[in-house]
């Protein structure tokens, strides 16, 4: 009987064991290929966002300065003046590496950063904040889990310092992913308990395995080249060889005029047809009761800020606008929205994060927004006028003064006068 079982399951067991050996002993040395790194940087795929190997490969290339551009779905709004297109066409001394997906917010960005901490130390980043992240209801666990993997988990566990950031991150992770691996260790961190030597040994073993697995499987991307051609190369020929904002504005304006003809909200035709028009009546007054002032997202944002401060990263924050006509149609309160922007800015500026491009009041400008809440056309040019000098003439990070009060529930739910918060 045992012999028959071995004949059936033995080969499977041996094959599985050999795969584990292959992964564990797979070489993790990085070989650079600038073309492939550009493909990955502009692909804006789930893999390029959450896999370690693709990010590290680009960010450590000595022949090109890739800069993390962190956000969510705004990066997929490609046109002739998108940041990736302008950087490539005019051979900027940097290239954006886009890290974001629809549905991702600060918590996903925090765990993604854990994979690249040595590679962002004392460098620069661009971080786009959408006030729409700051909802009263926590975002769905499924949305978080879609962009989270075991390598992010063990990277966090190796990097954590047992401080308030570690406690908050562990607590949030247990809530967003209740069946997460190494749950017992996370529970210790969430309670502020010290880890044992055995805990650290387990973390180290899992971390090495996850790194090797990322090196082996994370390098494969069949979509990267096609996406780069679609997202970047196809637009290069439309731009003048000599850089000029006036010329670029004319191109962007003509493109916008030609592609916003089927609606009076200034939205791109395709987006309006497939995302708005079919449910137009449903959207009327839809955001009347929205409140961006009370949200756990403020605490999650503090996780990211603490990490930037620890890593001495000089960050440019960009605050997105809302399409003014869309705001009026859905009855989103502009007073509430601007109050939320004020709260976000206070959390940033009071701790030394003073590089802020605030476009929250530009939502009524023609061709500034491509759909409901995302930059496009003239918005991308305004973005470039701030981002390009920030990255072309890099300065060291300021001396940040972090305030743990921003991890409190008091702050997350505060909706009063910002100046009165103690």
Predicted regions and their residues:
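Hydrophobic membrane-insertion alpha-helices, especially the h-region
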Residues: 6-27
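Secreted/periplasmic serine-hydrolase-like ester/acetyl group-modifying domain
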Residues: 36, 156-300, 402-422
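Loop/turn elements at helix/coil->beta-strand transitions in domains of secreted/extracellular proteins
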Residues: 64-66, 94, 121-124, 310-315, ...
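C-terminal regions of proteins
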Residues: 99-101, 335-336, 342-422
